[in-house]
């Protein structure tokens, strides 16, 4: 299947897995909306794409904020006309903090980005993909082997990655009748 004319949104596109994935989509011919908290890192990702940078759109985004996620999808549709793939990659962690020392704020920060952020982006992707012509698309969630083999002192991260499994399965089921597929990758240790 040709990627010509296809559009992807990649969250966490300024570093690590997100950056590599965004560059891979560009190499395959996709237009890519680069989403992340730090504009300067998104611009660096675009610059690394070389001539393909003309097919990028850097959108500073806080995936935990509904208005920011809506703005990301709106800007992407305005620039490229549609959304074919969403890679929910943005993530946070509090690894190394013993459960008994974990603050509510640390817990909430990880849940807000990893689970709520993925939900908000999935919701906007679903709305967009359901209403575009031709309809449908792919939503790919970044899971983790930590959901199955937790790292010590990683309760919030591990819990959110379990949540991603449930969200992915539910979205996959709900999306079938609209030609929206949803899957997840369980990436092991990687530089992020």
Name every feature range the model reports, one short phrase each:
Residues 97-99, 106-108:
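Substrate-binding pocket helix/loop in short-chain dehydrogenase/reductase
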Residues 133, 149, 170-180:
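Active-site-adjacent segment of SDR/Rossmann-fold oxidoreductases
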Residues 14-16:
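Conserved glycine-rich cofactor-binding loop
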Residues 144:
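Residue(s) in the substrate-gating loop at a strand-loop-helix junction
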Residues 99-100, 149-155:
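Active-site loop immediately N-terminal to the catalytic Tyr-X3-Lys motif
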Residues 60-72, 104:
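The beta1-alpha1 cofactor-binding region of Rossmann-like NAD(H)/NADP(H)-dependent oxidoreductases
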Residues 122, 160:
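Active-site helix of classical SDR
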């Amino acid at each position: 299947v040709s990627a010509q004319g296809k559009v992807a949104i990649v969250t966490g596109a300024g570093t690590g897995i997100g950056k590599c994935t965004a560059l891979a989509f560009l190499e395959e011919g996709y237009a890519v909306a680069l989403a992340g908290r730090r504009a300067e890192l998104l611009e660096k990702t675009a610059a690394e794409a070389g001539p393909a940078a003309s097919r990028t759109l850097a959108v500073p985004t806080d995936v935990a904020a509904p208005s920011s996620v809506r703005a990301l999808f709106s800007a992407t549709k305005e620039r490229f006309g549609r959304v074919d793939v969403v890679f929910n990659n943005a993530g946070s962690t509090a690894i190394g903090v013993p459960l008994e020392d974990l603050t509510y704020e640390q817990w909430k920060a990880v849940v807000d980005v990893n689970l709520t952020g993925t939900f908000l982006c999935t919701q906007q992707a679903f709305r967009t993909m359901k209403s575009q012509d031709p309809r449908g698309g792919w939503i790919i969630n970044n899971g983790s082997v930590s959901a199955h083999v937790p790292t010590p002192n990683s309760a919030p991260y591990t819990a959110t990655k379990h949540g991603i499994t449930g969200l992915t399965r539910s979205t996959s089921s709900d999306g079938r009748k609209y030609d929206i597929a949803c899957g997840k990758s369980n990436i092991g240790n990687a530089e992020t």
